[in-house]
Amino acid sequence: MEKNTDKKKSSGWLRRFFFGGSRALADDVTNVEEIISPGRQIVRNFFERKLAVFAMIVVIAMFLFVFIAPLFMPKYRDTYTETTQQNLPPGFSMLSVPSELAENVKIIDSFGSFSVGVSNSGDLYVWGNTKIGTTGYDVADIPQEVQDANIVMAAAGIDHIIAIGDDGTIYGWGNDRLGQFGRKDEFAENNNIIEFPEELAENGVDVANVKKLTCGYQSTAILMNDGSVYVWGNKFAYSNMDAFINRGGFVDIDFTLNYVVGIQEAGNAVYTGTRGLYNQARADVTEKPIAMNEYLKGRKIVGLASGSSNICLILDDGSVCLVGDFQSGSVSVPKLADGERFVDIEAGTYHFTGLTNQGNVYSWGGDTLNQTAVPKGITSAVKIYAGAFQSYAVDQNGKLLGKWGLKGYLFGTDGNGADVFQRVVNGGRMTMTVGAVAVVISSIIGIIVGCLSGYFGGKVDLILMRVTEGFSSIPFLPFALTLSAVMSQMTLSENMRIFIIMCILGVLSWTGLARLVRGQVLSTRENEFVIAAQAMGVKSGKIAFKHILPNVISVILVTLTLDFATCLLTESSLSYLGFGVQFPRPTWGNMLNGANNATIIKNFWWQWLFPAAFLAVTTICINIVGDTLRDVMDPKSSADR
């Protein structure tokens, strides 16, 4: 019977707070114009403040954004890194093939963040992110002599471009500090540089006998029809370059990220100059690799296309096989129809694009950036090209039929080549989760301590307040840094570390709320309804938590809102200093930690601006909402100001 009465009382209190009292409570119904509950009045007053409403919308939108947006990023990984995409600015120009080239394509090539193209009329075009880091070079600044020449071949490396004119002249521009092109005395003295061949510098190359021009990471190779090879550039990037100098008999050559690779006339292995490297093959990414000679069974390798750490080989029967390592979740090699076979293969950093004798185009391999999403309707292609994360299909007239893959990055990339937008979204989720859990912990402790201390008073109040003062006397930031440093020496999982950080924030930030609740309870316990409850014999715990606490809930809500913003800033401060959530797991704080040097602040502004903006906007809006709640819930505080 008593439980039913309690339920009715609590439900009645909630009903009156949010929906107002019954008209039957009035002595004269005809004199009642409108009865508004306290809750409705608070809501009405809040929505009259346009700035507060805007701030609340921003906070809600931010919450929904950081918790829902990751659901649409199934390929996101905290540990993702990509050397060829480091420090790229915001933009979507990587697939922006110039309109003049799109109607008359002869060559398209790319190794990193920019692409180079040559038209059938001999004009050269460059697009994408063309500025080379902080070097000051911009490959879009095409030398005048190249613009005046009739270009027949071109290839792009990570930071340079090599082009060949119809007269055999070899042109190079971009970064040349590690022997990418040109001849300098300092190159000859550097053991880590293989200098541009003197005969090519003086006499050029016989264009009619050039079979392939290809560039890698700060290196270049030219394959001649007679099987000889010219190779030069950064030997530190490709330690096996010496194995290709003065060696002939090659039918194809290319660069992975770490090795020069080639196919010799025998066609029974991938040549690297190192025994045991790339000596296993498989038909698909899902299969287990076996020894190369066992896989070939007399078939011959006639061509290759190299990605970052893998190779696709074309066999003389029109089939393909894979060598090297592939990312998890890679797309499988397509199953061709009877009579269909591959006639050309091009490679990106992690994906491959193949053209069949029936004009069909397929892509497979790594698909983290949608490199394998071939548009429908490409059935009459005669030539394909691939960039680092892009692919192109061209018809017999040189007209671009389709392009697919990475367009660019909304917020640019960081120093590891990761998408800043995706890290901001996932970092916001982590920051808000840590802040919310910390506030819940501090609220539970603060409300219990404050309510007990304020209601019972005496020795209970004395003991609890001394404990509170003890916690408040702990210097928060040094203590948190010390605990984080201790944890870094312990074998803790990242999730456990994050949980401990939440607990640290919660356990050290409840003292202010406890004092506030204590003061409100001390004031409220002298009211008549409390005295009446005591006279009726209601238990002290029930009076404290069921009668007094609901009357101070408005102050608690305001404090929780403001404390949440404080916890966001505190977590971000710890992470910024390197003592919070650790890289590679992102938070807004540790993303700012990666942008704390002058080079990044000046040259790579997007790496700190976006996380800083999200953090600032969120905390400011939360504070605006909290201040407005305080004003509408406590009219006296507003009047005092």
Please place each PLM-identified region on the residue numbering.
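Transmembrane alpha-helix signature in integral membrane proteins
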Residues: 54-58, 111-114, 119-122, 421-455, ...
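Amphipathic cytosolic juxtamembrane alpha-helices at the membrane-cytosol interface
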Residues: 418-433, 453, 457-465, 522, ...
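Conserved core positions of repeat-based scaffolds
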Residues: 114-117, 126, 160-163, 172, ...
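Short cytosolic juxtamembrane segments of multi-pass membrane proteins
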Residues: 530, 624-641
